[in-house]
Amino acid sequence: MSGFLEELLGEKLVTGGGEEVDVHSLAARGISLLGLYFGCSLSAPCAQLSASLAAFYGRLRGDAAAGPGPGPGAGASAEPEPRRRLEIVFVSSDQDQRQWQDFVRDMPWLALPYKEKHRKLKLWNKYRISNIPSLIFLDATSGKVVCRNGLLVIRDDPEGLEFPWGPKPFREVIAGPLLRSNGQSLESSSLEGSHVGVYFSAHWCPPCRSLTRVLVESYRKIKEAGQKFEIIFVSADRSEDSFKQYFSEMPWLAVPYTDEARRSRLNRLYGIQGIPTLIVLDPQGEVITRQGRVEVLNDEDCRGFPWHPKPVLELSDSNAVQLNEGPCLVLFVDSEDDGESEAAKQLIQPIAEKIIAKYKAKEEEAPLLFFVAGEDDMTDSLRDYTNLPEAAPLLTILDMSARAKYVMDVEEITPAIVEAFVNDFLAEKLKPEPI
């Protein structure tokens, strides 16, 4: 266990009081679940979360007081109760050390040292954190993500009775009545044998309403093609009236608005951090893609349904948002040359498949996304924003969250060059240039 934790967190953490703690001591204490709390002292929601999380942490750990108290480990025993095997580590986005110190001072858990900014960025990228506050739970032995939305855990299970909050099968979470907009009620068992789109959306969200209009047409085309497909709307509306108004535009099913517990469990199951989000499942309830929104917008005729992920994507207006999700390899080509984009995809696909398979075997997301970028206004804007040369072909890795780029400017790009470039990046052998 200690090897994984040291690789993830480094050798030292600090307490709120500034004392150093050896990471390997967490293994000695029998920690089974690790919470990573991503936040910042300047964020009011983070301040609110810290207060509720301190009470939650105290209750689960059995500390003397359900709030800030002595350093982690207080009250630990040789064979702690399972819920005491929880530890939390704060990962800060603060840019001012004094503000960071003031914020962590009263935290009863551990924190990544302020100086570990590079490690902070690695954690953001590894777990695809897109906003703060965020709280995720990991199996402390394997590193596998147990729960991506710890904020809902604190709200829904304040006593920690469901510890360690591992994922449950979709069939179990969705079990219960589902509605159609005409008032008809169906049991979730009616989904048997169908691909399912789980659609997290809300009427107050303009991008959601835009996607819904497109999705209605996609749903119709898929059904007319004879595919067994159903969509389940999971509302984030702020009132039942808004839910009803929005749902009236939809030809598919919905979790009843009044069933807040089931809606929350679905959000927890898929770690939803923003809307609109469309998760596409196979008939066994396993995730095919979390990028249903991008797929629907890119595939007007739904010919690629059910949209199994492609190792290499062609960069477009609709999928460019994925550049912000973590490091991305982007191969820029001269698309005026017929077949250049397809040849570029074939060039980098073998290494993309190898990386994806390697991390899938570890039940982890791949640390890189892979794109080919042709010549268009969006690509020109990306080159301008990242201050890249006009050369083509041009092999790059862009890390927007770290505001860093890595450029391999050579006359000829071969599979061996691509693989060496990727491996050197993953081994942290490349020197970044600022974006």
UniProtKB/Swiss-Prot annotation:
Cellular component terms per the entry's GO annotation: cytosol; nucleus
Catalysis performed (reactions): [protein]-dithiol + NAD(+) = [protein]-disulfide + NADH + H(+); [protein]-dithiol + NADP(+) = [protein]-disulfide + NADPH + H(+)
A Gene Ontology BP annotation from the UniProt entry: cell differentiation
Top-level lineage group: Eukaryota
Assembly and binders: Associates with the phosphatase 2A holoenzyme. Interacts with PPP2CA; the interaction is direct. Interacts with DVL1 (via PDZ domain); the interaction is direct and regulated by oxidative stress.
Molecular-function GO terms, alphabetical: thioredoxin-disulfide reductase (NADPH) activity
CDD domains from the UniProt entry: PDI_b'_NRX (cd03071), TryX_like_TryX_NRX (cd03009)
Entry's family note: Belongs to the nucleoredoxin family.
InterPro entries listed in its UniProt record: NRX_PDI_b, Thioredoxin-like_fold, Thioredoxin-like_sf, Thioredoxin_domain, TryX_NRX_thioredoxin_dom
Keyword entries, A-Z: Acetylation, Cytoplasm, Developmental protein, Differentiation, NAD, Nucleus, Oxidoreductase, Wnt signaling pathway
Gene name in the database record: NXN
Domain Thioredoxin residues, every copy: 167-321
Coiled-coil ranges per UniProt: none
E.C. code: 1.8.1.8
Residues the record lists as N-acetylserine modifications: S2
Subcellular location(s) of the protein: Cytoplasm, Cytosol; Nucleus
Protein name according to UniProt: Nucleoredoxin
Function: Functions as a redox-dependent negative regulator of the Wnt signaling pathway, possibly by preventing ubiquitination of DVL3 by the BCR(KLHL12) complex. May also function as a transcriptional regulator act as a regulator of protein phosphatase 2A (PP2A).
